[in-house]
Each structure stands twice: as C-alpha cells, then as structure tokens.
C-alpha cells in the first residue's frame, strides 16, 4: 500500500511528497505547518517505505525508473494534505483527504457496474496490485456497512469523496484517524464501519448540527410569547459567542420539541439525524455540537465556556444530588468553546471565582470549567445546597419531595432566603483555596432568630417502610422523614481539602441529631451556632501534624462544651472541626484521628457519622456498613463505639404491645430474634434484634456462648449422676 514513513520526512519534503494513499496511521503531532510533518504515516506493510531514499538513490533515472517515479507521483493523488492545525497535545492534526474513487482507477468500467459489483462483494475486475488492494479495502468498507448505508458507502468509494480526519486526544503512541465517513482507517488495511457513536464524526457534521441548533434557538427566541423563549445570559457575549441557557421548564420543552422537529428532517449516512443523536450515550460523546444537541433534547442546561473562565481558585464541596460536567470542544485548540451539562450523580465538585468575578466549578479528574456568572451570594447559595445545609434536607417527606429534583429546587429556594438574611454586602471573605484554607473571617451564617427559623427544622420521627426504618436522602431511601441518615463511605484515600468538606457535609446532615443528643445529656441550652473562622486544626492539617490536629480538636470541644453549658454562643465550625476527625485524612483514621469524646454526663462517638440516644443505648449508623432500614446499636458492656447488633423496626407500638413486650435496660443482653420495645423520639417501637458485624462478638454471641457452657455443664452433671 502507498505511504510515506516518518523516517522519510525532511525539511525539504514538499506538499506533493506528503500525499498519501487511503490507508495511514498517525501519532501525536506537534506545532508545525503542512509542509513539515514530523510524523504522518507509517504503514508497516506498504511497499513505498523509504520512498525518498529510493528516489535519491536513482541518480540519473532510466526510462523504467522514470515510469516508476511517474507511478509514485500518480499514487500521491489519492490523498492530499491540505492543512494541519496547531496542536498543544490536546488534539491531533487535521487532515483533509480527497479520495480519488474507483472510477478513476478503472476508467473502462461503468461506475454503476462498479457500485453493483462492490455491493455483491465480488473481486476486483483488475489484476493491477495497487488497484486490487484498494478495491479490497473499499469492499470491506461496503461490507461492514448496514442497511441503506451500504449504498451510500459504495457510491462514495466509486465516485470519490472528501473527508476530514482528526487525531486522537493525548496520543502517546500510534493512533488512528477518525473520518466523518465513520471509517476507522488503520495501517493494517482494515476499515471498520462504526455504528452510532458520534464521537467518531468530523467537524463538518458537527458544524451542521451546530447550525441546526442555532437556527432552532433563533426560531424559538423570535417566535411566540417572550416567556417561552430561550434567553441569553444577560444578553452578554463571550468572545463573540452568545452564552445561552435554558431557564424555565416551558422554554426548555419548547426548545427540545423544536430541535426534534429540525433534526428529524435530515439524514447522515442513511440514518436519521435525530435518531443518531438520541441513540448515542452522552457519556460516549465528544464535547461538540452533537453533545450540545443531546443536552437540549434531554432538557439539560448548557453554557458556553470561554478561555478566561477556565482558571481560578477553587474550594471543594461534595455534591450528593446533581452532578455538573463540562469540557471544551476538541475542535477548538484555543479552549474558548465548550459545554456544561448537569445530571443526577454524586461526585466531588469544586467552586471558586476568577479575578473577573466569574464563578468557576471544577469536577474531579476533568479540569476546570465555567458554571455561571454571579457574586459571592450566588456562590454561598450553591455551597449551602451542595453541603445540604438547608432545612428541607432535615424535614423531607415523600409527599413534599417525590424526587430529588423537587427537593433540590426547594433547597435552592431556602438557600436564597438564607443568603438574603445574611445580606449580600456583608464584607465577609469566604474565599477558600484548594488547601482547604478559609479566609480569616470565615463564613457568616445566621443570627439566632434566623437560625431558629431556617436551621432548626429537625423532625425526630423516622418513617418505617416495608417493616424497616428508612433513613437518609440517598437514592435508596428518599422517603425518609427525620434526622437519621446512611452516609456511604468514599474510601480512605481522600485528599485533605476534600476530607474537610466531606466532613462539613456529614456534620451538616447530623447537626440536629448531635445537638439534640448534647441537649439531652447536658440538660441545658446549646447556645447559638455561628461561624468564627477555622482554628489551628485546619491550618496544620495540610502539614499532616496529626497530634496537633487531635489536640486542637479536643481543646476546641472542651471550650465548646463549656460555652454550651452556660448558654453562650458556640461556633458551628467548632462542631465541624471536632466531627471532622471522624472522617480522617489518612488511611489510618482510627490511629491518628480522634474517635470518641467522653466525659461526665455525655458521650459522642465521632467514629460514627450519626449517633442518636435511645432508651439507655447508643444507636449508631456507621459509615459504609449500615444498610437502609437498619439501626446498629452498641452495648454498655462492650467498648463504646463498637457495633454489636441491629434493631429492625417492625411497627409503632400500641397499648397491647406495651403490656406484651419487654423494654430492655442498657446493660441487658438481647437474644437474636427477640422482639423488644425501644423508645425512638416520642414514641415506642417494636424492634426485632439482629446480629451485627460478624467480626465483632455480639450480645447474642455472648449469651449463646454462656448458654452453651451452662448446657454442657448440666449434661455432664446428669451423665455422672451429680
């Protein structure tokens, strides 16, 4: 097959000498113009290897050698390199290939006959090696096509076509070019027909889709009631591009319907364009106009990304609801274009602000991207929602919030109210960098009155579904009403800054439970929650001084308890600092981090994310081990914080149950399967005792062992007549 090896490229290589046959393979290309290709083609089995050396060695060519050189020049006409885009390693080069077509290689045969011959898979009508080899490639491409695409493919290879190929991203070795003909061209001579994935399409198709989207936007925006239009973000332009988003459900729906009608009118390679876009998973798409169309069809918000909005200082919070993803277009090496979409999936995201005031977001492993324009109030609203510090997260019911979308809409509304109560111009520095350092003044939250209104709506009732207690707001248990929550473990290898904000999230989800437990133990007020900055614990965290961290947490907790005992103000972040130790920033959290705090009249297990006080027992839901519908408990006879069993809630006890079932004391051993009464909140519940973690000897195990020993002793006594 015809090709030029990368070893034959020199400074004197001309454009004509870069011409290639239809099969080629490429590697990553650095910045260069079209006359200097350091790496273009390398087909191991091609018979034109070392072409330049061969031509130089001819000297004064004979007539036969002149004929051979003429064939070489003619073979170049099959592919023309018209231009190579500047690349910084993110995208490969851009090659425009002009396929000559079989009709030019077989001028004596009718093109229609050639097309029919290809469709039936017949051999090449010519015995010339180059023509025969190219025929086999074309026949393979036609054979791999499906349905009506076979006819389109056969017509293309017979009549010739112009295609554009793009290199793979971040290539470190040999790569392939993906053509907009859906062909995968490799050096081995294989041409496969891809089905469906739009990531293997080219710029012309993307431009067509982009044009159709833009036409749809203009039609929707200029027609109908203004409330039904797709509005631009403040009408602003970012580097010549209008940043638009789909605001309301009405306009989103109208835009989706209009785009469906528009795409349904066009076909690509014999396949309906609407079907092609819809049938491609958004996770498999390149971030181009096809992805943008997919997002519009799925009513996902879109934004335009500018190069100035791709840098900034970040803070990290954990999102348990909607996941925001964005990436720049691979066809734009200047990184001034891209798309953002949001979907329901938990992940770490970071929020920051650039020097021009744009709020930025970062998704772990995906780099930085633009989320929206606004001020610190908007950023604070996002943080309140992301960290689930809004009242609705503590008082949710299935009837009020049937899905997470409605829940997060309510949380966003409450976050706006909270920030409004704070005031937009508080002058508080809440900038946080990637090391987890917060500005000197910390985050100012609420006054006592506002705190009572927005942050204390904690219900103490747990809902039972199918005979089990339902806790939390994760996807397995959205029907909960109460303050118990199953928190899934993220793993030990967590960065320090991520760990702190994961701690913020978990503490935020259990503040009501913790403070209620403290109130019961201390028999006094808990004081006012407010933020007064971050102690030395967070400042030393990045240096890994574990002893200092633990000592600081102990001291902070001691001072916090002293203030609470007298009803004085207590920093909310003081509680976070203490409970932060339950997350741990090393893989040896139990050895290096504070696991429990105990004293006269109170006990807090910071080794567990949720601790609640029931009748003489500490009921805990440990990270990573609890299942939905279960409350694990510990016994006062065993070490504090050790999981020994589970209580399965059956139903709320009625009058007859109060007389028929026992209410165990804190030190009583419970047999597995026993049904007992437990005080949960204001009501008593019938609970069935289950064994806990198999790695721990449970109360049931202890009692079974004691019973077995007693039975064996009695049997021996009977055997010997004692």
From Swiss-Prot:
Q: Which UniProt keywords apply?
A: Host nucleus, Virion
Where would you find this protein in the cell?
Virion; Host nucleus
Gene Ontology cellular component annotations, sorted alphabetically: host cell nucleus; virion component
Its function, per the record, reads: Involved in transcription initiation and cap-stealing mechanism, in which cellular capped pre-mRNA are used to generate primers for viral transcription. Binds the cap of the target pre-RNA which is subsequently cleaved by PB1. May play a role in genome replication.
Subunit structure of this chain's protein: The RNA polymerase is composed of three subunits: PB1, PB2 and PA.
Q: What is this protein called?
A: Polymerase basic protein 2
Lineage in the entry?
Answer: Viruses, Riboviria, Orthornavirae, Negarnaviricota, Polyploviricotina
């Amino acid at each position: 097959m015809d090709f030029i090896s990368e070893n034959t490229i020199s400074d004197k290589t001309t454009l004509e000498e870069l011409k290639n046959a239809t099969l080629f393979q490429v590697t990553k290309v650095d910045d260069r113009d079209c006359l200097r290709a350091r790496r273009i083609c390398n087909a191991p089995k091609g018979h034109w290897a070392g072409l330049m050396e061969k031509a130089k060695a001819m000297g004064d060519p004979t007539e036969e050698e002149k004929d051979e050189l003429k064939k070489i020049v003619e073979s170049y006409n099959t592919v023309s390199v018209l231009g190579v885009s500047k690349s910084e390693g993110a995208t490969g080069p851009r090659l425009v290939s002009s396929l000559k077509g079989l009709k030019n290689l077989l001028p004596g045969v009718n093109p229609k006959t050639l097309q029919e011959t290809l469709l039936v898979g017949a051999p090449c009508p010519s015995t010339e090696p180059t023509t025969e080899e190219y025929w086999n490639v074309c026949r393979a491409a036609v054979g791999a096509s499906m349905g009506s695409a076979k006819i389109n493919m056969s017509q293309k290879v017979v009549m010739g076509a112009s295609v554009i190929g793009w290199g793979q991203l971040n290539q470190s070795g040999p790569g392939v070019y993906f053509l907009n003909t859906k062909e995968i061209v490799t050096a081995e001579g294989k041409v496969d027909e891809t089905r469906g994935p739009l990531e293997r399409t080219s710029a012309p198709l993307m431009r067509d889709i982009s044009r159709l989207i833009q036409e749809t936007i203009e039609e929707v925006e200029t027609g109908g009631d203004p409330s039904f239009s797709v509005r631009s973000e403040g009408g602003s332009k970012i580097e010549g591009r209008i940043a638009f988003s789909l605001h309301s459900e009405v306009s989103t729906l109208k835009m989706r319907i209009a785009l469906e009608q528009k795409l349904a009118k066009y076909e690509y390679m014999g396949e309906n364009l609407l079907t092609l876009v819809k049938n491609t998973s958004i996770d498999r798409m390149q971030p181009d106009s096809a992805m943008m169309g997919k997002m519009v069809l799925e009513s996902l918000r879109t934004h335009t990304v500018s190069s100035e909005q791709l840098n900034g200082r970040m803070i990290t919070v954990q999102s348990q609801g909607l996941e925001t993803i964005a990436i720049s277009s691979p066809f734009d090496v200047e990184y001034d274009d891209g798309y953002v979409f949001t979907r329901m999936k938990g992940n770490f995201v970071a929020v920051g602000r650039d020097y021009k005031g744009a709020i930025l977001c970062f998704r772990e492993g995906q780099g930085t991207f633009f989320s929206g324009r606004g001020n610190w109030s908007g950023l604070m609203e996002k943080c309140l929602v992301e960290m689930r510090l809004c009242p609705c997260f503590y008082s949710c019911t299935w009837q009020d919030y049937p899905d997470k979308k409605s829940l997060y809409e309510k949380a966003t509304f409450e976050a706006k109210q909270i920030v409004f109560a704070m005031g937009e111009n508080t002058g508080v520095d809440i900038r946080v960098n990637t090391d987890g350092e917060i500005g000197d003044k910390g985050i100012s939250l609420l006054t006592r009155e506002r705190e009572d209104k927005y942050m204390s709506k904690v219900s103490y009732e747990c809902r039972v579904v199918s005979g089990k207690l339902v806790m939390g707001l994760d996807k397995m248990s959205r029907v909960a009403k109460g303050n118990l929550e199953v928190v899934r473990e993220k793993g030990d290898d967590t960065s320090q800054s991520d760990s702190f904000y994961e701690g913020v999230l978990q503490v935020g989800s259990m503040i009501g439970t913790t403070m209620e437990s403290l109130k019961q133990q201390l028999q006094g007020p808990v004081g006012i929650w407010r933020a007064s900055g971050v102690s030395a614990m967070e400042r030393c965290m990045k240096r890994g001084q574990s002893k200092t961290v633990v000592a600081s947490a102990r001291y902070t907790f001691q001072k916090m308890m002293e203030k609470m005992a007298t009803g004085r103000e207590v920093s909310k972040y003081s509680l976070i600092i203490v409970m932060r130790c339950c997350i741990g920033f090393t893989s040896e959290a139990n050895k290096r981090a504070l696991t429990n705090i105990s004293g006269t009249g109170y006990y807090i297990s910071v080794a567990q994310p949720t601790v609640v006080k029931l009748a003489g027992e500490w009921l805990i839901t440990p990270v990573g081990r609890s299942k939905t519908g279960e409350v694990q408990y510990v016994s006062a006879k065993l070490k504090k914080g050790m999981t020994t069993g589970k209580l399965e809630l059956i139903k709320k006890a009625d009058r007859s149950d109060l007389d028929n079932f026992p209410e165990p004391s804190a030190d009583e051993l419970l047999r597995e399967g026993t049904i007992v009464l437990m005080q949960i909140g204001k009501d008593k519940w019938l609970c069935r005792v289950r064994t806990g973690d198999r790695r721990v000897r449970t109360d049931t195990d202890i009692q079974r062992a004691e019973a077995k020993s007693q039975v064996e002793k009695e049997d021996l006594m009977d055997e010997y007549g004692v």
